[in-house]
Amino acid sequence: MTPDVLKNIADTLEARREAAPQSSYVASLFHKGEDAILKKVAEEAAETLMASKDKDKLHLVREVADLWFHTMVLLTYHGLRPEDVVMELHRREGISGLDEKASRKPTA
C-alpha cells in the first residue's frame, strides 16, 4: 500500500461530504452526523478486537481496514486528513511513550 491510497480515499471522502445522502454509503453517514459516524467507528473497533481474539489474521486485516476507513470518515467530518495524523506520528517518533503522554496538556 502506498500513501497515495490514503490520499485517494481522503479525496473521495471529502467529495462525498457534501453529496446527497442517497448517492453513497459515506454521504449517508455524513448526513446522519457525528453520532452515526462514532457508532460505526466503535462497531468496527469492536469487530477488530473480536478478530484479534479469534486469531484470524485475514479477518483481522479486513476489520482493521474497516476501522481505518471509518476513522478516516470521522477525520473528514472534522475537516482533517490522514496527513494530520501522520504529522502527529512524526512528532512523536523517537519520544518515549511515557514522556509523550506526560507532555500533553490536560483537557477539560
Swiss-Prot record:
User: What does the record give as the reaction this protein catalyses?
Assistant: 1-(5-phospho-beta-D-ribosyl)-ATP + H2O = 1-(5-phospho-beta-D-ribosyl)-5'-AMP + diphosphate + H(+)
Pathway stated in the Swiss-Prot or TrEMBL entry: Amino-acid biosynthesis; L-histidine biosynthesis; L-histidine from 5-phospho-alpha-D-ribose 1-diphosphate: step 2/9
Which Pfam families does the UniProt entry name for this protein?
PRA-PH (PF01503)
- Top enzyme class, one word, equals hydrolase
What processes does the entry annotate via GO biological process terms? L-histidine biosynthetic process
- Cellular component terms per the entry's GO annotation: cytoplasm
Q: Which InterPro entries match?
A: HisE, PRib-ATP_PPHydrolase-like
- Report the subcellular localization: Cytoplasm
Keywords of this entry: Amino-acid biosynthesis, ATP-binding, Cytoplasm, Histidine biosynthesis, Hydrolase, Nucleotide-binding
**Which PANTHER family does the UniProt record give?**
HISTIDINE BIOSYNTHESIS BIFUNCTIONAL PROTEIN, HISTIDINE BIOSYNTHESIS BIFUNCTIONAL PROTEIN HISIE
- Family classification: Belongs to the PRA-PH family.
Protein name per its UniProtKB record: Phosphoribosyl-ATP pyrophosphatase
- Natural source organism: Chromobacterium violaceum (strain ATCC 12472 / DSM 30191 / JCM 1249 / CCUG 213 / NBRC 12614 / NCIMB 9131 / NCTC 9757 / MK)
- The record's gene field reads hisE
